[in-house]
Amino acid sequence: MLHSQVPGSVLAVFAHPDDTESACGGTLARWAGAGAEITVVICCSGDKGSSDAKAKPAALIRRRAKEAAAAMGTLGLPTPVNLGHPDGSIDESLRRQIRGEVVELIRQRRAEVVLCPDPTAVLFGRHYVNHRDHRDVGWAALDAAAHEAGLPHYWPDRGAPHQASELWLAGTLEPDTWVDISDSLETKARALMCHESQLEEPGEWLRRMVERRAESDGKAAGVQYAEGFRRILLG
């Protein structure tokens, strides 16, 4: 189904500093341009996101935070909320903590739509295994949105209950909803190029990769370029 409605308030919860743009940057840029209030939450600091053995984690955290802020500005969004948890550290205790943090943000922002990674998506063909942080953050956000933020006895110290209407899972193997990003594809590509620490040679190859992925989703939706999601109705 091609989805054209624009929600009033959106909370996008992802693991690493560049995940949001990759998963749904075109959709968020389109929604922001139409007046949606959007908060992006980055759960992990990006402290391990480098193949350079000499890179210092503290410097990497600072650099990636600046890159994320620049990318959000490119999409027309405010500076993201950085929870600052170390990469690869999400055990059961920390996942519970993230649930509470997401519940509080859902309640504060009165989010209508919560966007997060699909935690059930693990193997993408023969060449990509979904990062564990993506899956762990997806489960935490899913549980917070579906079961906890709307009930008063969950996290009673984290604000008044609020039930989001919809949960959108990005990076999914089972898309059933698409957003036309034909007018925001270039914006998405420019946002991803802000993450220079993650790119060996920023340039045309990244734009082509973004275009190919969006073109594939676009064929499923009957438009030139799209992003696909698994949409769960909660309200």
Which residues does each predicted region cover?
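Metal-dependent de-N-acetylase/amidase catalytic core
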Residues: 1-11, 92-235
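Active-site rim/loop-helix segments in enzyme catalytic domains that contact anionic ligands
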Residues: 1-109, 230
